[in-house]
């Protein structure tokens, strides 16, 4: 394996066949609502961390999840997940993060009873990808958080959130995302060990750690 090969445990490949051309088709509210009734919406969600290992979450005030949640939002046709994550990050925090700074955490499918768009009771079906990036102290100091969909924001120690006795009970999707974010450290160490041709016992110990 090449020394600059992406970590296959923390990488979501993007393939383009032929010459794809982005379009700027705009759907009005009614059309968008009908689209949500018929199709699965792709989302690029974010778990930002700082240089101390703290993780940012937002407390939403709108459906489909009016509670603590990841930042982020939908992808647009033609986006890579890194491009979508960067655009969503700029919108919700004011921070511009280059595509190469984003890393894949996990992905999942989701069904929600309610949604923000009318008719709210029709719900929404989503395919969500969670990405992560570490921001600098300077970036954290200049963040301008979006208040349109969030009532508050908070920084948390991710390891504390997944303890059995954690005070804050997370939605299962968010819990999985935080758990996979914590596991990413082990995945990165495993990838580095394989690239360095580390002893089999060291590699095996890291693999076993992922299954605990």
Segments from the language model and where they lie:
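Short, glycine/serine-rich, charged loops/turns that create anion-binding
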Residues: 53, 62, 109
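Conserved N-terminal beta-strand and adjoining loop/helix that marks the start
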Residues: 30-55, 74, 128-134
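Acidic, metal-coordinating catalytic segment for phosphate/diphosphate chemistry
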Residues: 2-45, 120-121
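A short gly/proline-enriched turn/hairpin at secondary-structure junctions
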Residues: 68-72
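Unchanged
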Residues: 75-171, 207
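A generic fold-level signal
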Residues: 39-41, 50, 63, 123-126, ...
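Nudix hydrolase/Nudix homology domain
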Residues: 2, 64-66, 140-212
